[in-house]
Amino acid sequence: MSTMSDLFPDLVEEILSRVPITSLKAVKLTCKQWNDLSKDSSFTKNHYGKEAKEIQVIMICDLKACLMSVNLHNHKDLADPSIKQIGKLNQVEIDSVFHCDGLLLLLLCNPKDNSKLMVWNPYLGQTRWIQPRNNSHKHRPAGRFNHRPAGRFYMGYDSNNNHKILWFSSMYREYEIYDFKSDAWTVIDVNTDQDHIIDNQRVSLKGNVYFIAHDILKEEAFLLSFDFTCERFGPSLPLPFHCCHEDTVLLSTVREEQLAVLFQKSDAYEMGIWITTKIELNIVLWSKFLKVDMTLPNSYWFEDLSFFLVDEKKKVAMVSELDIETCKNYKTYILGENGYYREVDLRKSKGCVYLCVLMFQVWCKSSKVPVLARCERK
């Protein structure tokens, strides 16, 4: 009698290539041969390349992390977005999320243990719990939850692909690094300019974290990076525009290869989006991606933008802002060239699409194969 182990390798690979990412973990347990094949680099590259035709994003829906699949152009008429839920983390309530190379760093909403962190790999269903140092992570009333840490957490990796977590408090000028390999926190000595304020706009790209920062004396914004190999902040890098603290500046990534920045001036009816043509720790070059004239008919002035995505192929951007009237739902729009403008009601889509006020970050996974780094401790 034949068994699954007797199947030809090509046939097994074809079978596994048709399995959705969210079901792959269960399938791997079927037999050792299937488990070994799923870990093969050539297979994962081909398999996840097929899965990446749609943009995958993380949304915080009713304090739960949901893995969503977004298609900005189902049809040929530029953009016909759809959205569906393909995964959900139900066990915990989440305050904030930070994405790094396929892994998610979650800060939990737990009054009894208010500094608990979880790292989640939604593709493999793996989780890892991390406890910050109690004596250093001071808590102060802030925002929606008064147990939120005064500092912030960010994740990246060094030149050896070893993942790390950065915690720092701008208020107290304190910095710590958590090393996944050693499972330990270390206090680091980092010199930062007292006149610089680091904004909450931040993204991970190629292992480093990039921030929007403000120079108080010069009254201008700039790009700042943190290098997890050297465990130091990089030099100030220019943005492709001059802005003040009242203007809207958002960061995003494109295919995990480039940075994108959105700029809306507080006193002008115009929005611009730029994409990097070169990005390193000490140099950045920008190219204009999209210009939106908000004086045109049917256009709209955005009051509280929270995130955006770009689709280079269709030359469109998806932006979202908090609904001021309800302070709960998010309004989403598709913007394009020549005055293209369309409002999208994601609440009509299937799946978990009710977005609460804490949903402030979206991450794009397009053409690049996600790194399937393991979260669990050895």
UniProtKB/Swiss-Prot annotation:
Tree of life domain: Eukaryota
Entries under SUPFAM superfamilies matching the protein: F-box domain, Galactose oxidase, central domain
Protein name: Putative F-box protein At5g51000
Disulfide bonds: none
The species this protein was found in: Arabidopsis thaliana
Pfam family, one: FBA_1
InterPro entries, per the entry: F-box-assoc_dom_typ1, F-box-assoc_interact_dom, F-box-like_dom_sf, F-box_dom, Gal_Oxase/kelch_b-propeller, SCF_F-box_component
Domain F-box: 1-47
Gene3D superfamilies documented for this protein: 1.20.1280.50
SMART domains on file: FBOX (SM00256)
